[in-house]
Each structure stands twice: as C-alpha cells, then as structure tokens.
C-alpha cells in the first residue's frame, strides 16, 4: 500500500468513527498522535480485498430466501407458550400497485410485529386483499376482461411488491375477499344480522344514468353528468338493504372513555371515532300543535329557546311517515326524497324543503313555529326534529330566510357563532313556560345502505318469490356463488342478465323465484373479513359452525393493535358495531366489552410538496423505483424516520438519502470492526506507518469506566427504543437507534484517542455493542441487521440470536 493511499484510508477511518466533517479531522485537537497511529495501523489491517461492501439487493435477497426456507413468520399454534398478539394491518384494494402510503402503514405494523416476536410473544400478522368493489370493476371495464382476472393479476403483483419490501406477513393466511370460501362469511353475517333485525330493507335515493341504464357511485358523477357517457344523471328511489347501527351508537360512544384510559388508542383514532359519532349534547322538550299533536324536538342551544323560529324534521323521522298519509303532503315528501335526500354535497340554499302546514306552540310563548321537513337535519343531528334558531346556526339562518325572507341581520359565511341577543339562560332540567326539558344527546352516525347495484360484489343471499315474498336462504345453502366470467361494460347490470344466476327455486315453497341481483358493498365485507384471518388455512373449508367453535378465535381476539390510515374511521367504527352485535347474538360472546381492537393507531397520509400525491399532479413516488435504487431497508427506515405516524409525511428525497447513508455507515463501520484482527489492531504505528512504542496503558479503573459507560449507553438506548416501540413511536425509535450508533463510535474514539490501542476487553465491548445495535435495528431494517449479526459471529456461523436485548452488552 502506498503512503498516499494509506493516508487517505486513515482519514476514512477517522470519518467512520467521528460525526465531524472529514476536513476538520486533520486539525482536530481531539485526536492525539497515538490515535492517528492507531488509525494508520487500522487502515493498514482492513484495507484491500475481503471486506464486504454494502449491497442491499444481495443482502435482502439472501435474507428473504432464508425467511422463506424456515417459515420465519408463520403464525404459531395457539397451544404454544407466550403472550399472543394479533396485529391487524389495513386490507389493500387490489388496485394494481402498492403506493408509498402502503409502505408507511405496513412498515409501522411490521416493525411492531418483529419487535413482539423478538420479545418471545406469539404474533399473528396477516391480511386479506379487499378485491370486491368499484375500483376492480372499473379496472376490468378498462381492460375489457372479467373482474376476477383483473384482481387475480393485481393481487399477484402487489404480493410480489410487498415481499420485495420484506414485510413479515404470514403469507399462508393471505386471501382475497372475492374468493367464495371467504365471501360466504359476508353472506353469513348478512343473514345473522337480518335475523336479529339489524339488517333491513328500505327505500333510498341512488344516482341513475338513463343512457347507461345503471346506478352510479358518487365518484362516477362529475358535475351532474355520468363519467362514461357524459349525459345527465338523475336521482331515483329504489329498494336498498340497510345496516342498523343506531342500536349501538350510544355504546360505541360510551366505550371511548375506556379506550382512551387504556392508553393504547392514539388521539387520531379517538378523534376519528368522535367525528363519525357526531355527538351533540343539548336538551329535548315536548311541543304540540293546536289540536294536540305532539312532537319531541331537540336543540343544542338551551339558552336560546326564545329565539326559535321554526322546527326542522328529518325525512327519516318516524313521524314523517304518519304525516305522509296526507295525499298532498305525501306527494311533496316524495318529491323531496327524489330530489336528493342523501346528496351531502348540496347546500342549505338548495336542499329540498317541505312545509308540512303544521304549527307547534313556541316553548317560550312566542309566535307558533312552522314545521318543515328537510334533509339538512340528518347531516347535523341524525333522523330527529330540531328547533331552528337562526341566530345560533348558519344553516338555520338560511332556512329561515327561505321561509320568512331576509332578516335585518343575517349571519355571514365567516360567522362561527352569531351574536346572542336577548337570550335567557335556561338549565337543561329547568322547565320553560311550564314545558319540562330533558338532557339529551343526538348522533350524526346512523343506519346506512350496504347494497350496491353492481355486479362485482358478494351476492346477497335473498330470493324473491311471488308466493312467499322475500325469502332468506338457509346457512347450509351458502355460499351463493358469483359467476367468475362476468364482464361488465359500464351499461346495465350483467349479473341481472344472467338467467343461470337469476332464475332459482324458492327454498320455502319450491316454486319459481328470482335472486337478489344487488350485491353487498365491499365496506360490508370489511366489517367481518379481518376475523377469519384468525382461522388456520387448513380449517378454512370447514363448516361455518365448526370454524366458529374453534379456540383460535378466542385465542387471537380482540386484535391487540390495528394500524391503518386516518381515513379508516368509518371502517373501525362499524367494525366496533358489528362485534358488539355478534357479542349479543352469540358468536363473539367472549368479547365482553364488544371491542374488536385493544389498541389502534391511525397514521396520516404521505404527501409531497404539501399536496396529496396523485398521477394528475405528477408527484407520485414509486416504491419499486426506490427499492431498485436504494433497497427495501432504506425505504422502510425512511418512512419511519421522516415523521411521527400521527403527522403527514411530506416526502423528501433527502430523508431517503440520509437513511441510506446511515445504513451504509453502519455496515462499513461494523464490517471493518468484525473483520479486524485483534493482534494487528493492538499494534501501534507511528505517523509513517512504522511500528511504534505504545504509550502507557490507562489504569484498569479508567478502562472499566469507559466500558461501563458504553454499557450504560446501550441499556439506556434499549430502554428508550423499547418504550418507543410499545407506543408505536417509530420516528423516535429510529432516532434513538441512530444516537446509539453515534455513542458506539464515540466510545471507540475516546478509548483510542487516549491510549492508541484497543485492548481485548475494549474490542469485545465494542463488538458486543454493535451486536446490540444490530438487534434493535431489526424491526426497522431487518435485512441488513440480521446480516450484520451473521457477520459478527466467529467462524462464519449463521445461527444468530435475534431476541430483543434486555439492555446489556451482547457478547455472543
């Protein structure tokens, strides 16, 4: 080795030990002559061929092959020892590609799953593809192929992407919701809830395109026109299937206090549940018309009753049906419903408004209050009746203007709370003019439709018979099979055109009948299909009764933690509803509080330049390209490092480069120390690289003190990282891993700067600290971490200990 190259290598050694810029190392007083001599000798010993460079693709390929060979992430048998944790990730739509939001979500869940396994806990970490629904149908229409072929191809591609990223899912338990063996559970759930009165048939508004002869989802209506033919869309009334969640809304609200007290639900998740609930506290009071017809009304403004100008009633209020017996009023109500009862985009100025002609006595003795029916009530208070107080509510002000003309002072768009004038403070239990008031709560959350007029979805197990009416199938007749060769075109419903599907025999009387051709919304599938993940793959084809009796459900439920995007609030709320219903019905009676998830983390989305990623804006980040350039470990580490899960991640290439640089530094530094011959490293050299006399050794107490300090640094780091992982604070955990690496390098710098050599005990402590570093790195960058542990083993042994360190230095 030439003198010039040796000096260059020495500077690189200094840089690997210190975080200071290389230029400053030449003049730093921190580095003594002995330290420089050590580095010259060190560079001489490790330079040349044989020291492995960081090749993420080779490392990741090797580790993933090893994981597959030993089935590293298979779900343990429930009889095995150890605490059990079902970590539930979100179910991806079979959209064709994994996006960076998926990478963030699954990196969080995977880090936690690996951490739990390392601590000796039994982990179930698996998911199913959400392969039914509109996205798959639209993809099939574009490709002019059956949706079954589209979703199969998408699932295969997405699985390969996820496997390249090294996520530790139990792939044997992966499934697609469009598989008959799985969607029979959705049909079972439908029948179970139908028998309990929690599923019912009603009438609702849908968007309809006369040209395409099909119903449209909200996203398919663009400025009132059909997305496909660009002709006008109109709202029609048709029968729909509804899920009655109203029975459990109050319990879902009440249980939130317990979930918050547990400390395992983050504030994002709790806030989403409160938002879905839409709870409003106030009072209710009983009013009546001049002829004694009663109506209970609600208001959140107990201190402004004398300002009431009218009463607004939801079209879904039960009393509206009574009023509909009046022929003229019934016609007006029908016009209201056909005019867009469930169009949330409509404003109060254009929302339908029907004057019932009824007048209620004012609670404060003022002018009688006209009663109007308007869907503006539903979006604020649910299907109820409310006092209209224009001076307190902007929507009420708009309705009052439509009823009575412009007021002298109208609340402007910027007014959050119109000025209070001449109000009398009224307690929630005080009578008003002899009319008693009661504390009351209203919720925006209410029953919703679960059926869709589309072909690619779970068939509804219902037939229609002229003699028997609506007939539910028996559970023994499940599953009702969806034809796999359906090819939707965007016009009509191909399922309704299949005679082999539609024409059946009535299971009740044996006569002719027709099947229901609506299908279940994929949202309904999601309410239950996370539970069959608990069922061993070998048991999936057993009868439903057999599966429900398995101990596996009791062993894995409730899920210890769910990790999902912040837009999953409705899914989680409705899953909480379903588990409470099945607790009461019987199949999940062992969930005493009815809660499906002991803990919940909602992470925010990944954005770029402050905007949501989209192909239209050209700011999409392709995970495949990133993995090809930097490797999976770098991308996983970057999405965890860049921001707390509860904050939006503003994508930056600099974060990726920083994490890649960190992993390369850890690799190069560790490999060099593992490969260093202790005898060569302990031999001091002078500035010319020639042997030199070593300076006197430090006293044994001082040497022990430095090693003890290193051990304390490791213990502190492990404690902090453990706490971070338990709280799913991945951002903080990664930073603490990085700090530990800095501490390890600082240890070597301090010892060598003062003594010029590493004695055997010092080197052993350094190697042990690097093993600890590798083990705490496993949850975040598992491939490189395991490979480092293998490199640290003497004689090339490949058996490594990946258990979670207790904080002590790991000597073997």
Regions found by a protein language model. Give the residues of each.
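Basic, alpha-helical terminal appendages of large translation-related enzymes
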Residues: 34-82, 314, 386, 402-413, ...
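Active-site-adjacent bridging/hinge elements
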Residues: 81-89, 162-166, 367-371, 375-377, ...
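Low-acidity, Ser/Thr- and Arg-rich intrinsically disordered low-complexity segments
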Residues: 3-8, 16-19, 24-28, 32-33
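Helix-rich, typically C-terminal accessory recognition domains appended to large enzymatic cores
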Residues: 195-207, 299, 304, 439-468, ...
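Amphipathic alpha-helical
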Residues: 251-278, 314, 318-351, 478-481, ...
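Structured ligand/cofactor/substrate-binding pocket environments in proteins
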Residues: 101-113, 130, 177, 184-185, ...
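N-terminal, positively charged nucleic-acid-binding surface of large information/translation enzymes
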Residues: 39-319, 372, 390, 402, ...
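Short Cys/His-rich metal-coordination motifs, predominantly Zn2+-binding knuckles/fingers
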Residues: 212, 229, 365, 466-468, ...
